[in-house]
Amino acid sequence: MLFRCDRKITLPVACALHSCHVSAARLPTTFELELTVEELCKNKAANEFFRLPETKDCRDVFRCDRSGRVGPIRLAAIRCPTQLAFDVDRQVCDWKARVKNCDKLEKPTKVKPLFNTDEPLCPQGQLACGDGVCLPQALFCDGNFDCDDDSDENACSVDEDPNRAPVCDTKQCVLPDCFCSSDGTRIPSNLNPDQTPQMITITFSGAVNVDNVDLYQDIFKDDRKNPNGCQIKGSFFVSHRYTNYSAVQELHRKGHEIGVFSISNRESPDYWTHGTYDDWLTEMAGARLILERYANITDNSIIGVRAPYLRVGGNTQFEMMTDQLFIYDSSITAPLSSVPLWPYTLYFRMPHKCHGNAQNCPSRSHPVWEMVMNELDRRDDPEFDETLPGCHFVSSCTNIRTGEQFQHFLEHNFQRHYRTNRAPLGLHFHAAWLESNKDYKKILSNFIDEKTSQNDVYFVTMLQVIQWMQTPTEITAIRDFQEWKEKCDVKGLPYCSLPNTCNVKSRELRGESFNLFTCMDCPREYPWLLDPTGDGLDLV
């Protein structure tokens, strides 16, 4: 049959390395199909991209669009940008040299377990593999392949996992240990919005060093104070390489929160999405060991995790966090909505869809807080502009190109929170983005000064948000909220004005040398995954 391809782009493809626009230019408009569209689309998900044998360019893929104007199903065509190719296994556009499956037409189909059948196939407490063999229910989605066809690990999303966490039950989920709501928008203790402080969390992710410490000092000046008289605070998720640990020590001394962002900050999304328990343990618990020793953080205050590239590691990540006594994660994003979400605990099921391309959200119950990242609205004029996808890091809001746009962006998103349920407003930055435009830092500073002049707006750390949620306190009493009085007005000099410059090698990194700056004694070797303390342990 002859098929004319609908070239309207209805779903953009995510790029592995950067944001990109999908083009349909020069895609073939007509070609012969050996199968009907219905046959091609049988058993294919709406968001699955595949190739056709009739097309030769590795950039060209298609998906089944069941919302077309003509007929029940149509094919929607997309083309990756120049210099990129489409990886059907990972379902992303990537550099051509990294795509090794241009000859593959579609993502391999995994065998699914037989959860839904007309008649039960297994006795109570057991489920059927794809081949009909019955196994205990507890073996499904536990990270180990138990079925001969591996089907027990192939239906494990938040919506599919047979052992998933239950939906929110507010009678069982009670503060201070547990918080949930059916749609994620409920204010703790059902306070009225006008009696709820508007909390704003400013966070940075990455290395702390000479390139950004001046920026942090400017933003968090000593004289910038919340209405309770305490200096404003931020949260820093620190990666290891290129970090100056004496600078981290000073941030901690000033009362800012330090969290972990991994040791290696490895670029591969799959490494984080499908990482093993040991991968997450060495990366995050190891990063904490490095911070504790070389930034001299000895008060057990490093309790937060953010996954590199926000690639959540599923249940495995949260099992590690539970075992290692991490209190919260801040990697899961919630899609843009008219009313933002409050943070929640993972004892019960997430109150929103697992958002993002190929994300691996936790499906099981975990005693961990999720400091969910509400997407920000990046439209220049929300009243008239068409709907645009939200953004979680401010630096990923690619349409912000001028200081004026940034100013409107901050005010609009503040009002979205302030005028609805006052869920904490997260402003998540990479330092380099703020440095990229001379106006950005000034506009952010002006925004902070303006908001701290209100008696109901507080710039706090992630931990301080949790502390307030555990003991919800109305605005009339918030000035005396003791948990926000710690390190209220820190004065004095840094612990050391001239840190040690330690030039050390790493056997793990092929003998490469690095400079490590610390107020503490120098390590024998550069700390890395198998030797986070740098003691020079024997490597197997």
What is each PLM-predicted segment?
Residues M1-A25:
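Cleavable N-terminal signal peptides of Sec/SRP-targeted secreted and luminal proteins
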Residues H18-L139, G143-S157:
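Cysteine-rich, disulfide-bonded extracellular modules and peptides in secreted proteins
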Residues H21, N47, C64, V70, ...:
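Secreted/processed peptides and extracellular or luminal domains of membrane proteins
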Residues V13, H18, E39, K56, ...:
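Extracellular secreted precursors and ectodomains with disulfide-bonded cysteine-rich loops/domains
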Residues Y344-F409, N413-R416:
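Aromatic-lined glycan-binding groove of carbohydrate-active enzymes
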Residues L17-H18, D57, R66-G68, L84-A85, ...:
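Conserved beta-strand elements of beta-rich interaction domains across eukaryotes
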Residues R164-G259, S264-P269, Y277, G286-R293, ...:
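Active-site beta->alpha N-cap acidic-glycine motif
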